Amino acid sequence: EVSSVSTSQVLPDNATYTFEQQTKEIQAPQLWHPNHPALYKVISSLYHGQELIDRYETAFGFRWFEWTADRGFFLNGEHLYFKGANVHQDHAGWGDAVTETGMRRDIRLVKEAGFDLIRGSHYPHSPAFSQTCDEIGMLFWAENAFWGIGGHKGDGYWNASAYPVNESDRAEFENSVKAQLKELIHIHRNHPSIIVWSMSNEPFFTAPETIDPMRKLLEETVKLSKQLDPTRPAAVGGAQRPLGEKRIDKLGDIAGYNGDGSYIPEFQQPG
């Protein structure tokens, strides 16, 4: 046991109370790193008198990181040049109904191939996915479900506009995107493997008349992400379009340039 804290509170029936607890400072903790993924565990126990009513375990890790525009990424003071892979949460024969064993197998294979970063393409993944990244030492780019699929045809097509063309659909769509971002951060925030929250993937695959509201939604989700978790940067994934004054790569802290994005002169090459 590294540290413990106990708080008591008398509550009336059916009352709700939030406990705010802080342990003493932990001296020289082992730092989480892909090469040595040290993890700790918080055990939260709820008692009624001497009777244990509930118990919940939360794994977490200590690490610090820094993203820089000119020197790249640093983890615990060490410069890392990412060797990353896009990984979807699906399997042949299973589709999206992937077992946790299947997820762990995929992550182990990526690790054994020499990679150190996974981009969770292109939606929130299962907590088991993040947990496995923690346990085996895999950095994780966690992404929200706001993405274009290669075009901007009308509703009902596989490559429909990333942002709704019909104004009557927009409020519900935006609420859904923001709700999923909130859930993503609340569910996965304690995972040390996660070093960035991504707002999107290629949302520029949208109808021309929706470019402005698409950009506005990105700005709002970036702001929301920072409110919910100021410790991690907010990224715009798949930000290689559009060019000019409508570009989206500068709306967040970090931008991902997919496909030909690294060859477009307007974009700075990675550090």
Regions found by a protein language model. Name each.
Residues E1-T132, I136-F140, Q180, I195-V196, ...:
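Secreted/periplasmic carbohydrate-active enzymes, especially glycoside hydrolases
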Residues I107-V110, L117-G271:
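Substrate-binding/catalytic cleft of secreted carbohydrate-active enzymes
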